[in-house]
UniProtKB/Swiss-Prot annotation:
Keywords carried by this UniProt record: Carbohydrate metabolism, Disulfide bond, Glucose metabolism, Hormone, Secreted
Source superkingdom: Eukaryota
Biological process according to GO: glucose metabolic process
Name recorded for this polypeptide: Insulin
Primary localisation category: secreted
Chain's role: Insulin decreases blood glucose concentration. It increases cell permeability to monosaccharides, amino acids and fatty acids. It accelerates glycolysis, the pentose phosphate cycle, and glycogen synthesis in liver.
SMART domains: IlGF (SM00078)
Subcellular location: Secreted
The encoding gene: ins
Taxonomic path: Eukaryota, Metazoa, Chordata, Craniata, Vertebrata
Length: 52
């Protein structure tokens, strides 16, 4: 998959997609995922690091 910017609701959708039933922890102020996927493009595999 090509790297892409994932911000806001798109980022949440990507987390639901890759984490599925495992769920994920979404605390924007304590996570680097916004910097990793919104400020700079990330692959769709990167959000998996934030699954429960």
């Amino acid at each position: 998959a090509a790297n892409r910017h994932l911000c806001g609701s798109h980022l949440v959708e990507a987390l639901y997609l890759v984490c599925g039933n495992r769920g994920f922890f979404y605390i924007p102020s304590k996570m680097g995922i916004v910097e990793q996927c919104c400020d700079t493009p990330c692959s769709l595999y990167d959000p998996e690091n934030y699954c429960n």
